[in-house]
Regions:
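Short beta-strand-alpha-helix junction that forms the catalytic/metal-binding core
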Residues: 21, 45-65
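Short recognition patches in nucleic-acid-associated and regulatory proteins
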Residues: 31-41
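Short, charged surface segments at domain edges that flank catalytic/cofactor-binding sites
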Residues: 1-23, 48
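Flanking scaffold residues of small Cys/His-coordinated metal-binding clusters
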Residues: 16, 32, 49-53, 82
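Extended charged
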Residues: 1-8, 27-30, 55, 63-149
Length: 149
């Protein structure tokens, strides 16, 4: 069951996140479903309702993340933590492809998060492409891979 946070808390989280999903960096303004408040560390795993444990998340990222905080890397045989927007900077783990359609991992944490949340599923890539044509993606100031021709 989803917890209801006060409008003041929700507003503070939205402003802090620049109205972006803190995982996939979709802009809430253009989404058909309002973003949700995510517990970075789920309550079931010892997380709490403090602002230091809350993140703005689109419906899809929140649903895919669920209670996950890490995933098993089968090649390495170890758990890799997912990106924690309260402790880490997005640009340290991710960069947009030169065309802005795909999120590229820069680290194992980025790779694990992209896989767990399915950040580059076909439908969202198509939506990003349409948003690029409308000049509303990628987000202003977002790190973009250099085009190497």
């Amino acid at each position: 069951m989803s917890k209801k946070f006060s409008s003041v808390i929700q507003s503070e989280i939205r402003v802090r996140a620049n109205y972006l999903c803190e995982y996939c960096h979709a802009l809430e303004k253009w989404q058909y479903v309002a973003f949700t408040i995510d517990h970075v560390i789920p309550l079931t795993q010892g997380g709490d309702d403090s602002l230091d444990n809350l993140a703005l998340a689109c419906f899809h990222c929140n649903r895919r993340k669920g209670n996950l905080v890490s995933i098993k890397d089968l090649a390495l045989g170890e758990d890799i933590p997912l990106f924690n927007p309260r402790r880490e900077r997005w640009q340290d783990h991710f960069i947009w492809s030169a065309d802005g359609r795909v999120i590229i991992s820069l680290t194992a944490v980025g790779k694990a998060t992209i896989a767990a949340l399915d950040l580059n599923r076909e439908r969202v890539i198509d939506i990003r492409q349409a948003d690029i044509l409308l000049k509303r993606h990628p987000p202003p100031g977002a790190p973009i891979q250099e085009n190497v021709d």
